[in-house]
């Protein structure tokens, strides 16, 4: 349905975690729900858009595909649900909010997300590439398999929260659940810790990963590698790794969205007489015709010679900015010819310098006012 950026729809950053997504979704969905906006077609459409965005970003697999390839990575996208999906969409949100989960359960901690800044060339960004990165991170201890307990032993149920990971506090008419301070939410107590990880269940290691960079990425884009962040505590899920793209400066091109810019120096004779010159492109070279009287600042646009974007799949243009070069290190003969040209130009009064004449006219008007 929606082709807007899902992060923009929810108003969150690309590194938003699950709790932030849920909080924002709950707020927006309750605001635009059709039951609260009866007969408001725009509110209903906005609600569907919000729900569609949340369904993608709250699913780790769909989110990873979307982060890499945009809407094209979702195999046709996710169909927006109508108001009939309200109860299903909010069941886990309300149960979290009011502590209505049945039976109680111990809390495990998801591992931290990691960020890796990766610099690539403009050519790699345009065509896509695959590269290897090495990251430091917390991984589950091989000896205790992440439990933190010495081999042959196992963690015991926390006596304070009876393994729930939370304790209930009564405040007036309200009953509030809080994380157990004894087991820190794990529901387990390690009395005989693993000697390799000192009971932490995690150890510091370096991991080499292969990262596929899709064609068309731009500065600041991030690629999410699900489960490649730090290991969770007490057997919790691992966090994610966000590889943030940075473009190295290029000796010829500057990128602006999907467009490319470059400066093309041409001789003053070609600028005056016209001609044909060769200009660089990402794919090789192209030839452009230079009309007579071309001035510095003239822009030649080569259609579809820019970059094809990773999200909208539209291809930008190459914009060539002319810089007319003044000759240096003249030979006596060259200097003589130029002096002759200048002398003839002044005698016949012809308009050989349009910008100079325009500037002189403006200056004359300024001083005679």
From Swiss-Prot:
GO terms for biological process: chaperone cofactor-dependent protein refolding; DNA replication; protein refolding; response to heat. It is found in: Cytoplasm. One of its GO terms (cellular component) is cytoplasm. This is Chaperone protein DnaJ. Gene3D superfamilies: DnaJ domain, Heat shock protein DnaJ, cysteine-rich domain, Urease metallochaperone UreE, N-terminal domain. Residues 5-70 form the J domain. GO terms for molecular function: ATP binding; heat shock protein binding; unfolded protein binding; zinc ion binding. Its main location: cytoplasm. CXXCXGXG motif repeats lie at residues 141-148, 158-165, 180-187, 194-201. It comes from Nitrosomonas eutropha (strain DSM 101675 / C91 / Nm57). InterPro entries: DnaJ, DnaJ_C, DnaJ_domain, DnaJ_domain_CS, HSP40/DnaJ_pept-bd, HSP_DnaJ_Cys-rich_dom, HSP_DnaJ_Cys-rich_dom_sf, J_dom_sf.
């Amino acid at each position: 349905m929606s082709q807007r950026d899902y992060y923009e729809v929810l108003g969150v950053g690309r590194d938003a975690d699950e709790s932030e997504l849920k909080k924002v979704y709950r707020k927006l969905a309750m605001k635009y729900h059709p039951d609260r906006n009866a007969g408001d077609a725009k509110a209903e459409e906005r609600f569907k858009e919000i729900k569609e965005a949340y369904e993608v970003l709250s699913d780790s697999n769909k989110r990873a595909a979307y982060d890499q390839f945009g809407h094209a990575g979702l195999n046709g996208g996710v169909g927006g649900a109508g108001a009939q999906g309200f109860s299903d969409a909010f069941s886990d949100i309300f149960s979290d909010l009011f502590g209505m989960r049945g039976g109680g359960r111990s809390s495990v901690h998801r591992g931290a997300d990691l960020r890796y800044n990766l610099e690539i060339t403009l050519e790699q960004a345009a065509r896509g590439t695959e590269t290897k990165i090495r990251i430091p991170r917390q991984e589950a201890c091989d000896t205790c398999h992440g439990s933190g307990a010495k081999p042959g032993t196992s963690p015991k149920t926390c006596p304070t929260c009876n393994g729930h990971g939370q304790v209930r506090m009564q405040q007036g008419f309200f009953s509030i659940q809080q994380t157990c301070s004894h087991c820190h939410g794990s529901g387990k107590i390690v009395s005989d810790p693993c000697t390799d990880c000192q009971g932490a269940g995690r150890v510091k290691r370096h991991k080499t990963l292969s990262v596929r960079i899709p064609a068309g990425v731009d500065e600041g884009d991030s690629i999410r590698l699900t489960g490649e962040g730090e290991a969770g505590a007490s057997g919790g899920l691992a966090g994610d790794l966000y590889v943030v793209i940075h473009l190295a400066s290029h000796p010829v091109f500057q990128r602006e969205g999907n467009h490319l810019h470059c400066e093309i120096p041409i001789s003053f004779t070609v600028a005056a007489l016209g001609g044909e010159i060769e200009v660089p492109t990402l794919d090789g070279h192209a030839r452009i015709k230079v009309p007579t009287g071309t001035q510095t600042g003239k822009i030649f646009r080569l259609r579809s010679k820019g970059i094809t974007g990773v999200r909208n799949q539209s291809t930008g243009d190459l914009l060539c900015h002319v810089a007319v070069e003044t000759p240096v290190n003249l030979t006596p003969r060259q200097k003589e010819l130029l002096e002759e040209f200048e002398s003839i130009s002044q005698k016949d009064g012809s308009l050989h310098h349009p910008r100079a004449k325009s500037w002189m006219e403006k200056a004359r008007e300024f001083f005679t006012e």
